[in-house]
UniProtKB/Swiss-Prot annotation:
Gene that encodes the chain: cluh
Protein name: Clustered mitochondria protein homolog
GO molecular function: mRNA binding
Entry keyword annotation includes Cytoplasm: yes
Lineage of origin: Eukaryota, Metazoa, Chordata, Craniata, Vertebrata
GO BP terms: intracellular distribution of mitochondria; mitochondrion organization
Ranges of the TPR repeats in the UniProt entry: 1088-1121, 1130-1163, 1172-1205, 1214-1247
Organism: Danio rerio
CDD domains in alphabetical order: CLU-central
Gene3D superfamilies referenced in this protein's UniProt entry, alphabetically: Hypothetical protein (hspc210), Tetratricopeptide repeat domain
């Protein structure tokens, strides 16, 4: 199938705008000469030449079209109709014939490998017990690694035979392992223990099996009667109880079904020589449920009972002898219980949703777990002592050469879509395997199970190699980082380095290689795991480094090949090529920071490593003598001393800053052009002949002042014309009106609430007028400025008159561009690096660069922080816990070290009350991060045998109200007779191993407050956990969750009494495990992502069907690269479900959303804020499908999770409670419904202000329930409130106001009728003739309509004519945007809210 997508160039693998800039016309494969619009899916236009690398999201053109993601996809159809051939498998059916079963049909696709059919058969209920077989077509054995399309004679209807093959030792082991996996398939212990990429999911507990089976539901009437709607007490609004146990409800499927008591390797292994020659491979020892002990031989022909006992070796077959090719068949013969239970178990296994059992790409750990019985398990025991990672033993040569695998996958061809998919899939797979291996190795290193390569040195200086991975500890070895902050710098360097590796991998330049890098924090230590450059261990570092510096800049070397390769990355990464002086005082050219080292491996590849300074330094945290920061920074108390001197700006900040500068550049050029035009007109009027001369004499005023101070954009900003300077130096004080400009025409924006992809547009420029297109539109010359800048960049500029060139030159100087003819901002990462010296002739450049860095630091505090706070105020950013808050900071390029500054900023806001939820999450994040810093050093002094005692003691000091916590030193389990004087294992610095026990709660809290002050510059007003809870409104269970997730602690799931003053909350039995916290690179599926963005864009333009097709295509591509489980697939499924719902396909919406919930639980965690969102969406679709009780259960689950994660006081809780209240109203539980709706009303009033439309809607919902209860007075009171808000906010004529007014009339009539009836009763007593009052339960349709409204989905039937008008209007606007002619049009803009399914 050929799917036409108008905005994805087939030939651009990783659409880097820089490519467009270089290739000029060639990017436009249809050969159109118009260079204006070769837009790729990310919406970069060819203007990128004027812009700068990846910030190519041309803000000036797109600030306005934020709502349609990919710029003007519509006109692009004519401009360059790129056709993308998407591999669409036309699947076909084959017949499979397995021994002992009927032939069955299997749907396959030509792209699949034979191996994938093997996997399917090993998973099917009737063939799952076979592992050692081949597939044969007409007697020919098929090659496992062949693609089906390459097999001759294989077609629709072919018969494939499953033929049993003889076993080898390897095959026998695989068989036993597979049988064990089948026996354990419903057992959640692997998920609790965080092994084999298993993780938890509880959706099925609430949805009672699959949600698709609507057909089996009872009729509406009976459905209502059978619902038990009352939630548990702790879920009701106002409940202060936060139990922990319901976090993991017991799944009835998990009652263990025992098939065998013991399955283990026999101690008679391996077979002696004479038995090998009889075909014996290994011996198994088994105890059946009936308590029969048997010994089994695995031979080349299969499995049989032998006559051995525990003490007597007798390998002859037992009598009667059964030889079975499969262990399951043999066990079914000898144990009836096994046969019965195994069959039931497999039935249950296949009934589970596949997403509950597919492995996740990276391990997810659970911070709570129940007490599980530790069962005998031979495979687990064997795995613990061999390095089985993935499939080592299947690969020749045993251990994997990680470096070779990682680099070879990068070298795969990427010319067309199928090749790119193959390449990205390979890269992703190797990365997830490498991350798993590195994690396991890092734990082995810290647990003391790996021999060091320099065992003679003290522990903290040791380095390790295990499984072809190099491990080093995060300590300052050999005073390498002494000048940069010692151990603190050594701890920060690996994460900086990892960010550098991420950045270079994303740019993906051919011929430039980075190391596989994983950073693991485990038991208080930071371990860096890296793949090994071939040959590096044989040479001294001095000999191998041919680019960069090994001593922070004292000696520096360079290499032309490296300069050439790094030059390609410099544009997207905004790195300026620069010269530094070496020890001989001669200049050396670099295109990276000096620490970045280039090494050519023995494999001839060019590697770069030590990328810790890929991004420029953050001057707010780097005091430099004699340097003044900008006033914005100084006002907030910067620069501040930081623990180390490696504080860098984030890549997101650099991109936002450059984008911000680009807008500025465009405005300045436009203003100058206008002034020139005005001057020209004047002089033309005076005398035509001198026009040219006069024009050049009357150089515009603004320009002269710009010229005077080209170095400092901040100073030049103030010299622009007044209207413009207002627009550029806006910071905190930007008024709310400016923001209204942004909310123009969101046609059906269906990104749900937390669409990660939509969020990427948010880090646009500064707060205030810079955001909206309208601000630019006041400057009439903008379109000319854009054309001018483009034409300059496109040619050598010879055809352009000098005046225009001067305009661009001035604008370039003013914004700090490194080029004089085009906009190009880059940073020199070596500025302010101690020990780095620059040649004298670059002094001017250095001065400019210093200023640019100061401006970037000022931009962070004066623009990005206020814009984050503004987004929180208008609820476009809704963090719920520490992780989502950190993500919100990072999206805008704000490092977490600014957390104190952000909190301070909120504290001083007039609208502080409306930010209370964010402030509370921020404080809890600050406290738990400080506690984590302390915990790290605390754990380093703890012996392995005292670990659980130490961890529980620390948690008591942190969270328990028990005043005199006493540590239990682990003297209880064993006391050694002689004091062993062995060298203590792995305690850097040795010292007293019981020092940890002397910590007290008050001392810990003192340390936390001083850490908060020292690290975050924030003064915490509390001396104990109870004061913190009291003052900041925190919850202890939330603090426990945050600290456990951050440090990897796993605790027993039970109810903890934190507030008891008589006994501590935690005992050492409550600490079940410590897991590693792992950071790694996340390789991306670039093509799928482009499809996804184009789909979003289409949807937002109102083309739902086209959008839906693109997103389905994206889903296929995501699955192709990531496999079935990934966080991006989750976002894709959610959007698809929403589209299905809007387009009226409710069952399909339900099915996709169910997958999204399961995936979110498995990949992000069962109580991650995203999972809570997914539960809410699923409940809505369940309700629409008539599954009322399920909808309620899901909403109650979401509410419980949210209470644990952030408590009740959060704007999102209002939405949740409105949903619950509406569903309860629908099932006629009026009193319960009111509790939730009134709570929603209170929260909405607090966070949106009493006059907001959300509050008006809340009043209306409450009024409806009161009406159903016949309490008309209360109903009237609420509806009146709502009416007043509507009247004041949208005016009398608006539909909402009219509806409210009608409803008021109706309520008044009802109230009067009721009063009349009551009077009648009072007057005539019981024999009054009463007209029966009409009590109506709300119809399901009306409840659903309200549910849609509060969830941001509004359906309004449109006639064909309306649709055409709407389309015409959308196109007209786009045309106007292109030509830059939209004037301030706010008065006239379409009220689209009422025309289409809108989702806000």
């Amino acid at each position: 199938m050929v799917s036409k997508t108008d905005d994805i160039p087939a030939s651009v693998p990783n659409c880097s705008p820089a490519d467009f800039a270089r290739d000029g016309e060639t990017a436009n494969s249809k050969g159109t000469t118009s260079k204006k619009e070769a837009s790729c899916a990310c919406g970069h236009g060819v203007e990128t030449a004027v812009m700068n690398g990846d910030a190519g999201h041309d803000q000036a053109e797109e600030a306005d079209s934020k709502q349609d993601g990919s710029g003007d996809a519509d006109q692009a159809e004519d401009a360059n109709e790129q056709e993308v051939i998407v591999i669409q498998d036309t699947g076909f059916t084959v017949k499979i014939q397995a021994p002992g079963t009927e032939p069955f049909d299997l749907q396959v696709s030509p792209q699949e490998m034979v191996q994938e059919i093997h996997q399917v058969l090993m998973d099917r209920e009737d063939t799952c017990h076979r592992t050692c077989f081949s597939l044969q077509l007409d007697g020919n054995v098929l090659d496992n690694f062949a693609e089906l399309k390459s097999i001759e004679g294989l077609q629709e209807g072919s018969l494939l035979k499953v033929v049993e093959e003889p076993y080898t030792v390897r095959e026998a082991r695989i068989h036993v392992r597979h049988i064990r996996d089948l026996l354990k398939s419903l057992d959640p212990s692997d998920a609790y223990n965080g092994v084999d990429c298993n993780s938890l999911s509880f959706l099925s507990v609430f949805s009672e099996g699959d949600l698709g089976d609507t057909g089996k539901r009872k009729k509406k009437g009976s459905e209502l009667e059978q619902i038990d709607c009352t939630p548990p007490e702790h879920i009701l609004p106002g409940s202060k109880e936060r139990p922990l146990v319901p976090l993991q409800p017991q799944n009835k499927d998990w009652k263990p079904m025992q098939c065998l008591k013991v399955l283990t390797m026999s101690s008679w292994n391996p077979p002696p020589g004479n038995r090998k020659m009889h075909g014996d491979l290994m011996y198994l020892y088994i105890v059946t449920v009936e308590d029969r002990h048997v010994s089994i031989t695995a031979s080349t022909r299969g499995f049989y009972l032998n006559q051995s006992t525990t003490y007597n070796f007798s390998p002859k077959p037992a009598n009667p002898s059964f030889l079975s090719h499969s262990l399951v068949e043999l066990l079914s013969q000898i144990s009836a219980a096994f046969k019965k239970n195994f069959t039931t178990l497999q039935k249950k296994r296949v009934q589970r949703h596949p997403f509950e059992r597919i492995a996740t790409p990276f391990q997810v750990y659970s911070w709570t777990a129940p007490q599980i019985d530790h069962a005998m398990d031979c495979v687990r025991a064997e795995d613990a002592y061999t390095s089985r990672l993935g499939y080592e033993e299947h690969i020749p040569g045993q251990t994997r050469d990680w470096n070779e695998e990682l680099q070879t996958t990068r070298e795969l061809s990427r010319k067309n879509l199928p090749e790119r998919l193959l390449r990205e899939r390979a890269i992703f797979k190797v990365h997830s395997d490498f991350a798993a291996a590195a994690t396991r190795g890092a734990m082995a290193v810290i647990d003391g199970n790996v021999m060091a390569i320099n065992p003679g040195e003290e522990t903290r200086m040791q380095m390790f190699i295990w499984n072809n991975i190099f491990f080093s500890l995060g300590f300052d070895v050999r005073d390498h980082y002494r000048e940069l902050g010692g151990d603190s710098a050594a701890h920060a360097a690996p994460t900086n380095d990892l960010n550098g590796v991420r950045a270079y991998s994303a740019v993906d330049v051919e011929g430039l290689y980075t190391l596989g890098t994983v950073v693991v924090d485990y038991r208080g230590y930071r371990v860096t795991a890296q793949s090994i450059i071939p040959g590096i261990l044989e040479r001294e570092q001095e000999q191998s480094v041919i680019y960069g510096s090994i001593d922070f800049g004292k000696t520096v070397v360079s290499h032309p090949k490296y300069l050439e390769l790094l030059e390609k990355t410099s544009r997207p990464l905004k790195v300026q090529r620069h010269a530094v002086l070496n020890e001989k005082d001669s200049a050396v050219e670099l295109c990276s920071s000096v620490e970045c080292k280039g090494i050519i491996g023995n494999d001839g590849r060019h590697y770069i490593l030590d990328l810790l300074r890929t991004f420029p330094p953050d001057l707010n945290f780097l005091p430099v003598e004699g340097e003044e920061l900008t006033p914005e920074s100084q006002k907030l108390g910067f620069p501040r001393q930081h623990r180390h001197r490696l504080a860098c700006l984030r890549q997101e900040l650099i991109e936002a800053f450059v984008e911000h500068r680009y807008l500025l550049f465009m405005k300045m050029a436009a203003l100058q052009l206008m002034q020139q035009k005005a001057n020209k007109d004047k002089t033309a009027a005076l005398q035509d002949s001198n026009a040219a001369g006069a024009g050049s004499e009357n150089k515009p005023l603004a320009l002269e002042s710009c010229d005077g101070t080209p170095d400092s954009p901040t100073s030049s900003e103030s010299t622009l014309t007044p209207e413009d300077s207002e627009a550029t130096t806006v910071s905190e004080n930007s008024s709310a009106e400016n923001q209204e400009a942004m909310t123009e025409v969101p046609v059906a924006s269906i990104n749900g609430t937390h669409e990660p992809l939509a969020a990427e547009r948010q880090n646009g420029g500064c707060d205030g007028p810079l955001e909206g297109k309208e601000a630019d539109e006041n400057i009439p010359g903008l379109a000319q400025a854009k054309e001018l800048a483009e034409s300059l960049a496109a040619e050598d500029g010879s055809g352009i008159d000098p005046k225009s060139r001067e305009v661009v030159l001035n604008a370039c100087k003013a914004v700090g561009s490194i080029s004089n003819t085009s906009f190009d901002i880059r940073f020199n990462p070596d500025i302010f690096s101690p020990g780095v010296r620059f040649p004298d002739d670059s002094n001017d450049d250095i001065k400019k660069q210093k200023q640019l860095l100061k401006d970037a630091a000022a931009f962070l505090v004066s623009c990005q922080i206020p814009s984050l706070v503004k987004d929180c105020l208008d609820h476009s950013s809704l963090p719920m816990d520490g992780a989502t808050l950190t993500e919100a900071l990072h999206q805008r390029g704000i490092n977490v070290r600014y957390l104190g500054t952000v909190l301070e900023f909120m504290d001083n806001m007039p609208a502080k009350a409306q930010l209370e939820h964010i402030y509370r999450i921020g404080i809890s994040e600050l406290i738990t991060r400080c506690a984590k810093h302390i915990f790290k050093t605390y754990l380093q002094g703890v012996d392995l045998s005292a670990l659980s005692a130490a961890v529980s003691y620390f948690l008591n000091c942190l969270l328990s109200s028990f005043p005199d916590a006493v540590a239990h030193l682990p003297a209880d389990e064993l006391v050694s007779r002689k004091k062993s004087r062995k060298r203590r294992n792995r305690v850097p610095g040795g010292g007293d191993n019981t020092a940890w026990a002397s910590l007290t709660p008050s001392e810990l809290w003192k340390n936390i407050t001083s850490e908060a002050h020292g690290y975050y510059n924030f003064s915490l007003q509390c001396e104990s956990v109870d004061q913190a809870v009291e003052k900041y409104g925190l919850q202890k269970i939330t603090l426990l969750r945050e600290i456990s997730i951050k440090t990897g602690i796993q605790i027993l799931i039970k109810e903890y009494n934190f507030d008891s003053r008589h006994k501590p909350a935690f005992t050492e039995e409550d600490i079940l495990n410590i897991f590693p916290v792992v950071k790694h690179v996340n390789p991306k599926a670039s093509d799928a992502f482009h499809f996804f963005q184009s789909g979003q864009a289409k949807v937002q333009q109102g083309f739902l069907k086209e959008g839906c097709e693109l997103i389905n295509e994206a889903l296929n591509l995501f699955n192709n690269v990531y496999g079935a489980m990934h966080v991006e697939i989750c976002a894709c499924l959610r959007l698809l479900a929403r589209l299905n719902y809007i387009m009226g396909d409710h069952p399909e919406a339900l099915s996709n959303q169910q997958k999204a919930v399961l995936m979110s639980e498995r990949v992000l965690g069962i109580e991650h804020p995203n999972t809570i969102q997914e539960y809410m969406h699923l409940a809505l679709y369940c309700f629409a499908n008539g599954q009322l009780s399920t909808a309620l259960k899901l909403l109650y689950r979401a509410r419980y999770l949210m209470l644990v994660v952030c408590g009740e006081d959060h704007p999102e809780m209002a939405l949740l409670d409105s949903n619950i209240g509406l569903v309860l109203h629908g099932v006629m539980e009026y009193d319960l419904s009111l509790r939730f709706l009134e709570n929603a009303l209170a929260i909405n009033t607090k966070y949106h202000g009493p006059r907001s439309l959300k509050v008006a809607l809340s009043h209306h919902l409450v009024a409806r329930v009161y009406e159903s209860k016949a309490e008309f007075r209360s109903a009237l009171q609420h509806e009146k409130e709502g009416y007043t808000i509507y009247k004041n906010q949208v005016g009398e004529a608006h539909e909402k106001t009219k509806e409210s007014s009608e409803y008021l009339k109706y309520l008044t009539q009802q109230a009067v009728a009721l009063q009349r009836t009551m009077n009648e009763i009072y007057k005539n007593g019981s024999n009054a003739s009463i007209m029966p009052l009409k009590f109506t339960a709300p119809s399901m349709a009306s409840v659903l309509e309200q549910l849609n409204i509060i969830n941001g989905i509004i359906f309004i039937p449109l006639s064909q004519k309306d649709l055409e008008n709407l389309k015409a209007e959308v196109q007209r606007r786009q045309l106007m945007q292109d030509s830059g002619k939209i004037q301030e049009q706010q008065g006239s803009h379409l009220e689209l809210d009422d025309k289409l399914p809108v989702d806000d």
